[in-house]
Structures are given as C-alpha cells and as structure tokens.
Amino acid sequence: MHCLPVLVILLLLIASTPSVDARPKTKDDVPLASFHGADNANRILRTLWNLRGCCEDKTCCFIG
C-alpha cells in the first residue's frame, strides 16, 4: 500500500512527458518495416509449413 502513491505519481509523470526523438527525421528516412516486413512474414510462414511436412505434395500449402 505504501508503493501505490509512488506508482501513481510515476505513471502521471511518464504520461505527461513530451515525446522527443533522439534523432530528427530527414526526408530520406523510411521505416524498416516497409523493407523487411513482408519478406520476414513470408519466410516465417514458409518455415512453419515446411516444419509440418505439409508443402511436399502442395495439397495444404497456401504459400507459393
């Protein structure tokens, strides 16, 4: 019970702080997710299907 007021105060302080980027964005900045998101998702799904042994006869494989 002694920690509850401290926790509430910390949460209020964290919520009221302004968000500041460590490095200002330039016009050339592009999020990395746009480069790697689809490739990583396809690779992970393909690996999971291959682990199940499902893609050998292509009857239940939804990728490629």
Swiss-Prot record:
List UniProt keywords, sorted A-Z: Amidation, Cleavage on pair of basic residues, Disulfide bond, Secreted, Signal, Toxin
The residues forming a coiled coil are none
The Swiss-Prot or TrEMBL record annotates one GO molecular function as:
toxin activity
One GO cellular component term: extracellular region
Q: Where does the signal sequence lie?
A: 1-22
UniProt's post-translational modification comment states: Contains 2 disulfide bonds that can be either 'C1-C3, C2-C4' or 'C1-C4, C2-C3', since these disulfide connectivities have been observed for conotoxins with cysteine framework V (for examples, see AC P0DQQ7 and AC P81755).
- Localisation: Secreted
- Pfam families in the record: Chi-conotoxin (PF16981)
Residues that the record marks as modified (Isoleucine amide) are I63
Q: Which InterPro entries does this one have?
A: T-conotoxin
Tissues in which the protein is found: Expressed by the venom duct.
Q: What is this protein called?
A: Conotoxin Ts-011
Give the family from UniProt: Belongs to the conotoxin T superfamily.
Query: Domain of life of the organism in this record?
Result: Eukaryota
Which residues get removed as pro-piece? Answer: 23-51
What is written about domains in the entry's comments? The cysteine framework is V (CC-CC).
